[in-house]
């Protein structure tokens, strides 16, 4: 007999949407909200003049700049399932947030712009996802615009991303000639209409006109010549691409391919049904002790994200926790493993972008949030008492650095608080040099500095300037010998700093400097990442 807990597990799907910027990530997320009847119209980025913003872009800065800069957590009920979506920033300057999110999901939906094919950001994200053996479902978007040949796109996926493709949906032409899609597994053609209004749930309108591949109705709708060409193309596709195999997909070696237009909500319903039918329910996560299975009785979960000032009126900080095992119950006692203390949260939330809802129960796969007291950090584990720690939530060595100066020097204490909170949520990295009181910011991309300056101004009323500093890169320092580490510290004080978690860091002024110090101290470990 299936228990309530097992049933709850089977009915959950937790995934990240990943893509290159402007491939349609936020638009697709909103169509999920639309189809799940969470919203009635979508506020697309281009509608900013009418004060309609993307629902998943909830921060003021996101609305102002028209881009996603932080991961949005969204829970949607759909066809008796509960879908947990993490809509990640597409911009490469916010890649750290995306990398952390990949540790909290069970699979990914990858969006590919049909006009551009595989892009640089996509390559990097898929490399990380496949390193974790994360299953990938592919949605090729914007078929109603000028696009590459579908077979060319699939060739790019197979060659550049080294993953086998299995088409579920196949398009009838593309761009201005786009006529619709064919579902290979139910043998039905669905016709496309350019009259469809964006932002309205028109799924049913598409389904009114359907026919089988060999139906004469297809010849009448798209023309005999095109219909015959399309039938031959489908025959070719079926002969050269692998049939869908769920086992190979779950091993991350095969990706099912869906085509459509997220903006027009065309083909999105088939993607959503594929997620329900084939994507994994919550899976195990590795800890320092063992694999933790989702069906275990006792609660466990880890913090993969902290967001400061979700509610500016209350200056709150929200910790986002992926539940790995057990069941969360209202006011249950949780053990904060790192600080060795029990806590009881009076309010625990689920999310739809910037909106939050108090919940009383939650299961593995769910993303819950609670108000974060200052001792909660990214990577922290919560259990019912077991002393374990989940792996895989690192900080990466920044690529750009800036020195901070205050417009008003009397706000130093306030600045430290603001930067500490922003660094704890992963918006920026902060380093404090050994030999002075300066503060150095580290980022993956320059836009991160702009965002931090803006958020300090809006959320903390602090005004800062940033200046270039002579730092090429940083490495986190460790050694198996305390004496060796002590000697290294004494001899290199001017090049050392502490990060926000008081981990020792070496500040390299150049690539040559880094190579020299590494060769001079062979017993010192220079780490590119640091586990939270």
From Swiss-Prot:
Which InterPro entries does this UniProt record tie to the protein? EF-G-like_DII (IPR053905), EFG_III/V (IPR035647), G_TR_CS (IPR031157), P-loop_NTPase (IPR027417), PrfC (IPR004548), RF3_C (IPR032090), RF3_dom_3_sf (IPR038467), RF3_GTP-bd (IPR041732)
| Record's protein name | Peptide chain release factor 3
UniProt record similarity statement: Belongs to the TRAFAC class translation factor GTPase superfamily. Classic translation factor GTPase family. PrfC subfamily.
User: Which organism's genome codes for this protein?
Assistant: Buchnera aphidicola subsp. Baizongia pistaciae (strain Bp)
Residues reported to bind GTP: 19-26, 87-91, 141-144
The residue ranges of the tr-type G domain are: 10-283
Keywords assigned: Cytoplasm, GTP-binding, Nucleotide-binding, Protein biosynthesis
Any single biological process term in GO: regulation of translational termination
According to its UniProt record, where is this protein located?
Cytoplasm
Signal peptide (residue range): none
Role, per record: Increases the formation of ribosomal termination complexes and stimulates activities of RF-1 and RF-2. It binds guanine nucleotides and has strong preference for UGA stop codons. It may interact directly with the ribosome. The stimulation of RF-1 and RF-2 is significantly reduced by GTP and GDP, but not by GMP.
Which classification does the entry list for the species? Bacteria, Pseudomonadati, Pseudomonadota, Gammaproteobacteria, Enterobacterales
């Amino acid at each position: 007999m299936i228990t309530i807990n097992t049933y709850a597990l089977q009915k959950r799907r937790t995934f990240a949407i990943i893509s290159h910027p402007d491939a349609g990530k936020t638009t697709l997320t909103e169509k999920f909200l639309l189809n799940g009847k969470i919203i009635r119209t979508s506020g697309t980025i281009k509608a900013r003049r009418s004060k309609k913003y993307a629902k998943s872009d909830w921060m003021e800065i996101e609305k102002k700049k028209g881009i996603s800069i932080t991961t949005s957590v969204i829970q949607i009920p759909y066809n008796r399932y509960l879908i947990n979506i993490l809509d990640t920033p597409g911009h490469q300057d916010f890649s750290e947030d995306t990398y952390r999110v990949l540790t909290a999901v069970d699979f990914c939906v990858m969006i590919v712009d049909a006009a551009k094919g595989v892009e640089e950001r996509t390559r990097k994200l898929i490399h990380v996802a496949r390193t974790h053996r994360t299953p990938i479902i592919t949605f090729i978007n914007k078929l109603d615009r000028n696009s590459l040949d579908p077979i060319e796109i699939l060739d790019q996926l197979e060659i550049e991303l080294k993953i086998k493709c299995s088409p579920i949906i196949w398009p009838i032409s593309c761009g201005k000639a786009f006529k619709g899609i064919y579902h290979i597994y139910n043998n039905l053609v669905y016709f496309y209409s350019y009259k469809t209004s964006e932002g309205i749930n028109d799924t049913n309108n598409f389904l009114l006109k359907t026919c089988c591949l060999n139906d004469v109705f297809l010849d009448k709708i798209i023309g005999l010549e095109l219909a015959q060409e399309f039938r031959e193309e489908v025959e070719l596709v079926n002969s050269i691409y692998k049939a869908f195999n769920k086992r190979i997909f779950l091993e991350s070696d095969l990706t099912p391919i869906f085509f459509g237009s997220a903006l027009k909500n065309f083909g999105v319903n088939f993607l959503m049904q594929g997620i329900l039918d084939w994507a994994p329910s919550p899976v195990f996560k590795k800890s320092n002790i063992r694999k933790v299975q989702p069906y275990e009785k006792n609660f466990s979960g880890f913090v993969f994200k902290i967001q400061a000032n979700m509610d500016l009126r209350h200056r709150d900080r929200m910790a986002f926790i992926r539940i790995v095992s057990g069941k969360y119950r209202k006011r249950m006692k949780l053990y904060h493993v790192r600080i060795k203390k029990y806590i009881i949260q009076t309010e625990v939330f689920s999310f739809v972008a910037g909106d939050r809802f108090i919940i009383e129960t939650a299961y593995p796969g769910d993303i819950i949030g609670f108000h974060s007291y200052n001792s909660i950090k990214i990577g922290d584990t919560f259990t019912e008492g077991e002393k374990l720690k989940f792996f895989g939530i690192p900080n990466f060595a920044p690529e750009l650095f800036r020195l901070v100066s205050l417009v008003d020097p009397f706000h130093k204490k306030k600045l430290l608080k603001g930067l500490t909170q922003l660094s704890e949520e992963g918006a920026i990295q902060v380093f404090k040099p050994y030999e002075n009181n300066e503060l150095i910011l580290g980022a993956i991309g320059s836009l991160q500095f702009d965002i931090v300056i803006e958020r300090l101004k809006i959320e903390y009323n602090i005004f800062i300037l940033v200046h270039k500093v002579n730092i090429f890169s940083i490495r986190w320092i460790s050694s198996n010998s305390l004496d060796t580490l002590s000697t290294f510290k004494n001899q290199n004080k001017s090049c050392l700093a502490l990060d926000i978690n008081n981990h020792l860091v070496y500040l390299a002024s150049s690539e040559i400097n880094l190579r020299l110090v590494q060769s001079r101290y062979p017993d010192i470990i220079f780490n590119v990442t640091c586990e939270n």
